Amino acid sequence: MKLLLLLSFAIFLSSCVAPSPEPGIGEAISWNELPGWKNDRHAEAWPALLEQCKVLPKKKPAWANICNKAESTGKVNDETARLFFEAAFTAHRINPSKKEDGSPGTGLVTGYYEPLLNGSLYRSAQYRYPLYAVPDDLLRVDLAGLYPELSKMKLRGRVEGKKIVAYHDRSSIDNEDSPLRGKELVWIDDPVAVFFLHIQGSGRILMDDGSMLAVGYADQNGLPYTSIGKILIERGEIAREDISLFTIQQWLQQNPQQAQALLEENRSYIFFSIRENAEENPRGSLNVPLTPSRSIAVDPANIPLGSPVWLDTSYPHEADHSLQHLTFAQDTGGAIKGYARADMFWGNGDMAEKLAGEMKQAAELYVLLPGVGSKPSR
C-alpha cells in the first residue's frame, strides 16, 4: 500500500513540473529581472543607438519617436542612458530554440571580428587566391509578390537555358577553370585566410604597395552554410570542447592534402565589394557601422533587426567572468540561426581575433521591444 502511495505521489509530482516554454520572445518582464542590468556602462552603448537611428525610422516607423528623443537628448551618462532605455522599451526574455531531439535548448553567443589579410591587385605566385565581386549572372528572385508567405526567403541562382538552377558552389568557383574569371577584386596570399574572411564577412587587406584596402560582404551564392568545425567534430578530428577558430586553422595547416576538400564541403560562397572608407568599421545588415562589443548578428526571422538585446553570458574560458551587456541586433550571418543565438562583433586587432575565435558561451538573451511595459528598475 505504501509503495502504491509513493508511486502515485511521484507521478503527481512529475505532472506538476512546468513544461519548458515554447521557443520565441516571451512575455514582458521587469528591468530588475535582467541580470546585471544596472551595472552596465549604458553610455557606451549610446553611439550604437545613434548610428542605427540614421536608418531605422525609415524601415520601422515605431522607431521614429524613439530616435527623435535619442537624437535630441544630447550627452548622456550611464544613468541617463539606462533611464532612456527603460522609458522607451519593454524587456522580454527570449526562450531558446529546442534541440534536434526536442529537448529544451540553451542560448549561445559566439564572436566574429574584422581580420587583416595580405593582398595585391595583381595575381602572382605569392598572391593567387581571389576575392570575387558579385557576378553578373547571379540571379536574385523576390517571391513576395507571388507568395507572401515566402517573403523572408532569399532565392538566388542562375539561368541555364529556360530554367533557374542553383548558383555555382565553392568547389566550382575555386576551380582553376573558375566560371568567375574576370570578377576578381583582389588577390590574397593564403587560401585559409580567404575562407575565414568569408565567415567573418568583412576585413582589411594590407596591400603589397603598403596601402590598406577594406572589403565587405556584398552578396552570397544562395547555397546553405555548412560548418566545417561541426564536420571535424563528427569525424573525431577535434574534440567538441576544443573546437575554435584557432584549432580549425591549425588542423587545416597540418592537413594540407585534406584541407581543400574540407573547405569545399561548405558550398556557400561570399562575394565582396570594396568599402569606401577603410578606417570605418564594417557595416552590418542594417547598413550602419558596427560597434565593437555592442553590435551582434542575429537570426532576423526571430529577433527584429535594430532591437536592443541584453546578453547575460561570460567571457571565453572565464565562466566566472560575467559579460552582461547591452547590444544591438545590427547584423546577420549564415551560421546564426534560432532564437537565443547571437554573434558578437569584437572589432579588429589581436585581442578581437582572440575573443572572437574562442567565444562559444552559453547565454541568456533578452530583447528590448519599443513600448512601455516593464516595471522600472529600483
Describe the role of every protein-language-model region.
Residues 16-19, 27, 35-47, 278-378:
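C-terminal soluble interaction/assembly domains
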Residues 6, 24, 104-106, 198, ...:
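A generic structural signal for short, non-catalytic loop/turn and secondary-structure boundary residues
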Residues 3-4, 199, 295:
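Hydrophobic alpha-helical segments and their boundary regions
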Residues 9-10, 60, 322:
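Residue-level signal for mature regions of secreted extracellular proteins and peptides
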Residues 1-4, 378:
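Short, Lys/Arg-enriched, disordered terminal segments
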Residues 25-276:
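Secretory/export targeting leaders with adjacent low-complexity proregions
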Residues 4-14:
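Bacterial N-terminal signal peptides
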